A protein has these predicted regions:
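N-terminal, polar/charged subdomain of small-to-medium soluble alpha/beta proteins
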Residues: 1-123
Length: 123
């Protein structure tokens, strides 16, 4: 089975309470999330049925739910999102999640700090 097709959500924006420092988790910050799911979309393309694809409304709900739960590290937050996607979509073969924290507290000017996770099912 080919997994060269992708369903993606790009540019999701959340205000959330993540960070290593307690103050970050108290005052919050703006975050961006991109999600890419590799799957086979042939059945969805042929039969025009939502059940044959990765429902991007559900992808958004996964991201929103996980963004609402505070985490110290973006890496931990990203892993939670990836695992929820694999749990909800049996057809998801690979997942890429990008999370960016805008204006991170690093002692200088920085538009965003970003992590990129790429995971294959059963890795």
């Amino acid at each position: 089975m080919s997994h060269s097709d992708t369903v993606a959500l790009r540019g999701l924006i959340f205000f959330a309470y993540h960070g290593y420092y307690a103050e970050e988790r108290k005052i919050g910050n703006r975050y961006g999330v991109d999600i890419y799911v590799r799957t086979n979309l042939q059945q969805a393309g042929t039969h025009d049925r939502l059940k044959d694809t990765i429902n991007y409304e559900t992808l958004y709900a996964v991201a929103k739910e996980e963004m609402e739960k505070p985490a110290q590290l973006l890496e931990h937050l990203g892993e939670r999102i990836v695992q929820q996607i694999f749990n909800k979509f049996a057809s998801a073969a690979r997942v890429k999640v990008v999370i960016r924290k805008y204006n991170p507290p690093i002692g200088g000017i920085c538009h965003a700090a970003e992590i990129v996770l790429r995971r294959k099912r059963n890795e």
